[in-house]
């Protein structure tokens, strides 16, 4: 492993091998395009050609902060894991939606049904989001891997930066001032329960567990009103890591705002409320009039007393001081001016970004019309596409099948068709639909004997379920990947396929972009001649490409007629095959099978206990530690809470309840002493 540092670049690239194939020309072309000031470029890279490695080299050579946009959490997690391997010494961050579950606020007029907002926040991802914004403000060597969550409103970066607590050894500051500042930053005082986003006070020592940190806490030791020393320590064991001369504590939420901003926003909300009450009075709608007054006054009371309220994001326009219709502050506002953006699988991601606003707007309109929210709630929204275009830094679209938008906007198209491994695009075979199920059965058996895996894509959920049941009854180890499966479990299924826990994965639209499974040697596309989104030429090229990482890769398209989409997909695949074969012959390359270590691609994104191992290993037995003092008790509580959360995730509710009771007993003994 060679570590490379380019002149004037803060990045240290851990290079497992030098760029090869089309990579050197692609890297040079993109760097030249960035230097020439091209707003948009396209990297047309086939599956398995090392597009991620090319991106890493471009980032390292340019020396500029970067954001990589992906269209789903699975792909984002895969990119994040790879970028961390290339840049272990730099700030590689992960910015996706922190909701494990999210039910937005909504009103259904036909049934007079109001649905309250309900959500479950993944604390670890919330910490990573806060870490991303902190590093954007404090470091130059930052790479953010994000989903469309990046175009949704978060707190204003200017006000967020105003709310930091900067401490330095030798500073004169009273203990009560530090505590007051931490409370205003929405840190909780938890002398017993020391967790992320909290602080505790012990004599002249204040321990702060920064909201954006997963493993380090800050100890502020005071001597009278002077900061005597600052130490980083392990919040679980209490062991000191290092002494630091200065430290900046960032707020525990992106929505923290200074007190004077809150008061100004409250006055603005009152004015809008008055106008809305008058509107409903004129329209003779007393129910809506009373509803909006009651709900908004309750929120105002909370804002005056606490500085925040439930659903505070709906008042974001009043806090940011923006005019009606202006775009909300998003992650894009935190990016430095010299940032570069890569949009991975751009043929999907660009369309997805464009569609976010309209779905959100129709739901909000009902809430406004029926008095559940003030009209300003409409400005708590994702960016419209034209607004996103205005804030896009220099951008590289990355795709094997660029769509119309990329074709129209790209200043230059850089091709990366030749794979360094010499692997050739899969051979494409067309067979009749009539015998597709039985024909596929014999193909699957051939692959199983060779220790290879198979992906099967169908058109409907019902067909996928029936096919899975049928093959399962015949003794084939088969799983079905569908849209109801959450992100973590989806990653687990893909990992289990690679490990050989099953041999065949059936899906509908989930087997296309970005799935990196070198063990797959056969992709079967059922009903390939049914024209539509799932069988467009781009979809077919992407699906065929899933077998391109295997030296024996084959794609079978079951069809009774050859559609225009099929012809375009097969022709493009053949063009790429010929180019690769020619390259291999010229350079004497024998195609080599990719041997990629099987590990959890979300390693570092979700905790180890999230990886679903409990589901396969049965209940988690937790050894009870001996408790001699308060420090032992705090360690034991932290360990038991982890086990309790895992048991709940594994639906082992009785075990979770036992662990909860054990935690309660330890806390009671701490408070009142052992009986």
Swiss-Prot record:
Q: Which GO terms describe its biological process?
A: nucleotide-excision repair; SOS response
Name assigned to this protein? UvrABC system protein B
Q: Where in the cell is it found?
A: Cytoplasm
Which parts of the sequence belong to the UVR domain? Answer: 634-669
Q: What is known of its domains?
A: The beta-hairpin motif is involved in DNA binding.
Q: Which residues form the Helicase C-terminal domain?
A: 436-602
Chain ranges of the Helicase ATP-binding domain: 32-417
Q: Which InterPro entries match?
A: Helicase/UvrB_N (IPR006935), Helicase_ATP-bd (IPR014001), Helicase_C-like (IPR001650), P-loop_NTPase (IPR027417), UVR_dom (IPR001943), UVR_dom_sf (IPR036876), UvrB (IPR004807), UvrB_inter (IPR041471)
Q: Which UniProt keywords apply?
A: ATP-binding, Cytoplasm, DNA damage, DNA excision, DNA repair, Excision nuclease, Nucleotide-binding, SOS response
